[in-house]
Amino acid sequence: RWVNDMTGLPIEIHTHNDFGMGVATELAAVTAGAVCVHSCANGLEEKTGNAALEELMMGLHLLYGYDTNYRLDKIPELAEMIAAKSNIPIARNKPVLGHGNFIRESGIGINYVMNDPLVMFATHPSLTGKIGEVVLGKKSGKASIIYKMGELGLGELDDEKIAKILDEVKATGITKRDVLSNEEFVNIVSSVQAG
């Protein structure tokens, strides 16, 4: 702010993400009077990258109330195109873009995922054209199994079979160190049903 006050000139900011603070620094600069911020889609650039365009746009819009005139629902489409062209995949845990932003593995709160997503997620999935998703793995509970069976149209089972399915889901999640695909889950359900 003092540079702006001292010079009276418009201030621009260009940050790198060396300490994971590129976006935070640019948001702070905007609140201090910067009128132009530099960023790159998916945060890509040399070294550790620049401030991520998508994180900056969401921060300006949601945290500071700026109307950026951008189609936020197009962010994933742009990100996927950039990832494909650059041959640099989007990390699962990347803010705004990562697949992990709108998934829930643990059984607690799965009703919120679909009915009140802001209880579970930092932003509403629909803002970027996404939906919340329940996935299954080592942290899943009975409610997750029942929910996923309904989602996939697999019918209803008694508590004993649900417990067996849950045990298999947890064991598979631990073994593969990841969440299960729908196909893996359907195979487990079929196996338990066959008895």
Where are these regions (language model features)?
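Active-site-adjacent beta->alpha loops and helix N-cap segments on the catalytic face
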Residues: R1-N4, K47-E55
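Catalytic cores of alpha/beta
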Residues: F19-A32
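A mid-to-C-terminal "edge-of-domain" accessory segment
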Residues: Y64-G195
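Conserved, mostly hydrophobic/aromatic
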Residues: G33, L56, M149
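Alpha-helix-loop-beta-strand connector modules within alpha/beta enzyme cores
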Residues: R1-I13, M58-G59, L63-Y64
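Glycine-rich phosphate-binding active-site loops on the catalytic face of alpha/beta enzymes
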Residues: A32-G49
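Hydrophobic faces of well-ordered beta-strands that scaffold small-molecule active sites
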Residues: I11-T15, V37-S39
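Acidic, glycine-rich active-site loops and adjacent beta-strand->loop/helix elements
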Residues: N17-M21, G43-E46, I82
